[in-house]
Amino acid sequence: MLFRSVFGDGTVVIKRTVGHTPGHQALFLKLPKSGNILLSGDLAHYTDNWEHMRVPSFNFNKEQSIKSMEDTAKFLKDNNAVLWIQHDLEQNAGIKHVPAYYE
C-alpha cells in the first residue's frame, strides 16, 4: 500500500486504497491522546461490508477493492488503528461531533 506523509512526520498520512475509484485514498491520523485512526473514505460503506469484504457493484474494480481492504486490515493491525467508515450511521453515532474533538 503506497502512502505519503503530509507533514513528513507520519502524523497525517494519505494511503492509496484503489478500487472504489482508480485514485481512491484513505487518511491515517496519528493522534497523541486519542490514538490512531484511519478515515476510510469509500473503502467500505458500512461495517458489515468491511467485516465481510463486500464490494458494491458500482466500484471501479472489485479485485483492487478487495486487495485494498486486505492491505488496510493489515495496516490497521500493524498500527493499532481503528477504522472510521464514513457512511456507517451506527458507527458515526458513536463518535464525537463538533464542537467536540479528538486530540
Question: What spans do the regions from the language model cover?
Answer:
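Short, small-residue-biased leader/transition segments that mark boundaries at the very start
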Residues: M1-L2
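Cap/insert and terminal regions of metallo-dependent hydrolase folds
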Residues: P22-E103
